Amino acid sequence: MSRYSENIIIGAGAAGLFCAAQLGKLGKQATIFDNGKKIGRKILMSGGGFCNFTNMEITSGRYISQNKHFVKSALKRYTQWDFIALVAEYGIPYHEKELGQLFCDSGAEDIVKMLGAECDKYGVHIQLRSEVSDVEAVENNPKVRFKLKVNAVEWQCQNLIIATGGLSMPGLGASPFGYQIAEQFGLNVIPPRASLVPFTWRESDKFYSALSGVSLDVAVTNQHKTFTHQMLFTHRGLSGPAILQISNYWQPGESIHLDLLPYNNIRHHLDEMRQSSPKLQLKTVLSRLLPKKLVELWLEQGLIQDEVIANLSKVRLENLENLIHNWQFIPNGTEGYRTAEVTMGGVDTHEISSKTMEATKVKGLYFIGEVLDVVGWLGGYNFQWAWSSAAVCAMGIAES
């Protein structure tokens, strides 16, 4: 015999949990199925375990989608301030780290517990270790639009909400399930790729792996954007906030330009030093401005020569200027989904209502969160998209 829930949500991550709680709050029944052993697994890992749950400077211009204006409605109707108010209601201590980024003081578990408590409060049924299969549409029945199997048991529902996320962090249960459902029902899927992800070295740059663990502030630029933030050298390539941000705008084969001294000008600085301390060695001057290990590596590789700064030729000064302020780096690629924070691409937002997250072609089928072709900047933007898309989905169902 079939079981029934008015609203079935697949995925117990940020978007799925929040949508279920919001549905319950609006008087609607909701059931969540997830194949994992715990709810909110990705939330627990986020922000170094402290969950950067939103950003005070949310704006639609910091999201990427092939449908440029898609995010505007949801972000306006459920804002960062709405979510911050909920966090405050639960007495969760938090702080601003930088650039509007809000983190939990005690840990990401506070957010997961809050979402779990909201689901409990509003009677949401959560079933874990659940494999969903055989999703089908049911014709000519407004109360039963879909049927599916969960661990071989048939369930029916009026509304089916896909909150299965993207392909990033496969170790936490990521799968293409949401994309497969979209395609099954005739929706277009923008090819997914890893986003907010470190770059890897080409063979010619691998000597830089000796700097693994070294970080510095940089300005990183490509044809589309510039970000000024911290960069980290790793064994595999380049990481850190500046690199993760630019990865959203990078295309394979494209070069990025790195200014390793964004708050200073090496030519002006050396001109001043040649006036005041002409006998200083170049290594000494550079080691005061840049990580010493980086300067030593440049010397080892013959990219610079240690000499008295008074003797620096015009050509060597120009080469040094390019090395520091205009390092043209062509990534070999990215580290891929294993370390990517999120997935770019996904269900085509041209085929989704921006007001309700319902598929325009399929009544009762909704997509929320990362499964959609929406990706935000690093810094709480993607969590806010989860909250906002989930909230307007619940509103849309309650109003229909």
Residues of each region from the PLM?
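An anion/pyrophosphate-binding glycine-rich loop and adjacent beta-alpha core
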Residues: 38-39, 44-45, 54-60, 93, ...
